[in-house]
Regions:
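Proteins enriched for Cys/Gly/acidic motifs involved in redox and nucleic-acid/cofactor modification
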Residues: 52-326, 365, 380, 402-409, ...
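Basic polycationic patches enriched in arginine
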Residues: 40-43, 235
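Conserved SAM/AdoMet-binding glycine-rich loop
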Residues: 179-182, 189-191, 310-433, 444
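Short glycine-enriched, charge-decorated loop/helix-capping segments at active-site entrances
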Residues: 152-153, 290-291, 330-333, 393-399, ...
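N-terminal amphipathic/hydrophobic targeting modules at extreme N-termini
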Residues: 17-24, 34-35, 41
Length: 559
């Protein structure tokens, strides 16, 4: 059923909600600033325009609203989570509502994500909390609340954040009530936080990767500081002073998931199954900023996916720094292959994806489960990093070139239609031309569908940063260009293997450049463009692949 009504006035979007019997109309702004919301169903879906021009589905949970109604914000905050955060959500709502009424418009929030799928999923949670507080999500950074969820895997990511912070500082001078928050992996580095304290004093809030669930509480603290500043402005005996709130945890064993989420897509979703990493590859900062491995309980994961399916999700992406090591440390151990079998049993779920896999932990059992599955997508991201056994040892990857090649062959034999993708680093300290040729040899033998190629980035605090024989920049650039050409040439050949066949495609969006086309993904993660309209979004359809363009297909609906 299509919405017959979609009215946009002064940034307020009203929709008919088809899921409610009789067609009740709601104003999005009203929904977002009210302290209590009453619906006939436990979950009501309201479409709204959010970041990057995408359409998302905002899930309002009646149960959460009932909990919020019972909370007395004049009393002490609960100690248990997530009840403690519900308290601060309601407390922040009061301020946002009052400020919105004062300005005569809803307060807006913009979230920017740098980095991996884990960060993207974290950002959905952060934006969900902000919207539940009462902020309206927008695309541009001239918002009332700007949040950067940062990445620190490579130095360039840090530099991008610093550059954009300078622009935000200029905006904040014009709009003093604006709030700026920074979180994510970059904020776990002590020297980064110190630099921000000294150079970017206008930032309001800094927190890390371990306590993103505390956003409402931290925003509440910032708002209290803001009120104190305003009070000081009217007093001669006090000079207003901006206070930056910093709350970065070194590590945690706490997992808090039962909080609002603002999903980018209504039909697919990421699901965290574990956090942290125990591998300590010598070049990687992740274990230091994400902490040690900790797995979620299987029942919580299955319950979350079932709820997502009830809300219309047909595809999930199981997320973890190394999903293959899932289950270690649980009271009742369950390995990743066994978890996949349980997820497969969920009725209504059509597709299962996962990332990332570490080659040393990829078991025969997992390959067998993937081979017989009707739901696990035919795509496996298996980071290589280097084809040289000598360099792999220096990287602390704990496998050799020969072991990787044997594993890739085993996977392709068991699952002939699998799409293998990878990560490769060029210019690791001590890498010789011979080492680089070993990498090219693996690329030619495995014939990856695609590869993310990176120039080694020295990260302070990692063992590799202190290694001698750093490779000269011009040599690294030359190798990178040669590797990229090799990867692209092979990918163009491999990715065209399904031309003139019919494949099932999950339609994701109307094409940005050609609105008469829609764009979707095959099971093996290859992009397909074909004629269609927005009514196909979120549906699995059969598409005839007419032409291969090297890295994507052009097709038509197979009717």
């Amino acid at each position: 059923m299509k919405n017959p009504l979609k009215v946009k006035k002064k940034g307020i979007i009203c929709h008919e909600t088809p899921s409610i019997k009789g067609g009740v109309y709601y104003c999005e702004y009203f929904l977002k600033i009210c302290a209590s919301l009453i619906f006939r169903h436990a979950r009501v879906i309201v479409k709204s325009v959010i970041l990057c021009g995408k359409v998302t589905e905002r899930m309002y949970d009646e149960e959460l609203e009932k909990k919020l109604e019972k909370i007395d914000i004049n009393g002490p905050a609960p100690l248990e989570e997530p009840e403690r955060q519900y308290y601060f959500i309601k407390k922040c709502r009061k301020y946002v509502k009052e400020k919105s009424e004062e300005l005569g418009r809803p307060l807006t929030a913009c979230s920017r994500t740098f980095g991996c799928q884990m960060n993207a999923r974290d950002s959905e949670k952060l934006l969900g909390i902000l919207e539940t507080i009462g902020y309206q999500a927008v695309e541009t950074e001239d918002a009332d609340f700007v949040l950067y969820n940062t990445c620190t895997v490579r130095e360039n990511a840090n530099l991008r954040v610093y550059g954009r912070l300078g622009q935000l500082g200029a905006r904040k001078k014009k709009h003093p009530h604006m709030m700026i928050a920074l979180c994510g992996c970059m904020m776990q580095e002590k020297e980064v936080v110190e630099k921000i304290k000294k150079t970017y004093r206008f930032v309001d809030l800094i927190f890390g990767t371990h306590n993103i669930f505390k956003l409402a509480e931290l925003v509440s603290i910032c708002l209290e500081e803001r009120l104190e500043e305003l009070e000081a402005q009217g007093r001669e005996d006090k000079k207003p002073k901006h206070k930056m709130v910093v709350d970065v945890w070194k590590d945690t064993d706490q997992i808090v998931e039962d909080l609002p989420v603002e999903r980018k897509y209504s039909f697919k979703s990421g699901v965290n199954i574990m956090f942290g990493c125990n591998n300590f590859c010598s070049y990687c900062i992740v274990p230091y900023v994400r902490g040690r491995e900790r797995s979620r309980r299987p029942g919580e994961i299955i319950g979350e996916i079932k709820n997502l399916v009830e809300d219309g999700v047909v595809e999930v992406m199981l997320l973890g720094q190394n999903v293959n090591s899932y289950g270690k440390g649980l009271d009742e151990p369950l390995n990743f292959a066994e978890l996949l079998e349980e997820v497969e049993k969920i009725e209504g779920l059509e597709r299962i994806r996962f990332m990332t896999s570490h080659p040393k932990d990829l078991s025969d059992e997992l390959i067998e489960v993937m081979a017989k599955s009707k739901k696990i997508c035919r795509h496996l991201h298996l980071p290589l990093q280097s084809g040289s056994s000598r360099i792999l040892k220096a990287m602390n990857r704990r496998y050799t070139k020969e072991q990787y090649l044997a594993l890739a062959e085993k996977i392709k034999t068991a699952i002939p239609d699998i799409s293998l993708t990878t990560d490769i680093i060029v210019g690791f300290p001590g890498e010789t031309e011979e080492d680089f040729q070993e990498t090219l040899d693996v690329v030619r033998k495995v014939r990856f569908d695609s590869a993310f190629t990176f120039i080694y980035s020295k990260r302070t605090g990692t063992p590799a940063a202190a290694m001698e024989n750093q490779v000269p920049e011009d040599v690294v650039k030359n190798r990178f260009d040669r590797l990229l050409k090799e990867v692209q040439d092979i990918s163009a050949e491999v990715c065209g293997r399904d031309v003139h066949t019919v494949q099932t495609v999950l339609v994701e969006e109307v094409n940005d450049h050609s609105p008469e086309l829609v764009t979707g993904r095959m099971s093996n993660n290859t992009i397909v463009h074909f004629p269609g309209d927005a009514s196909l979004i979120g549906k699995l359809v059969d598409v005839y692949l007419e032409e291969s363009k090297g890295f994507y297909y052009m097709g038509r609906l197979n009717q």
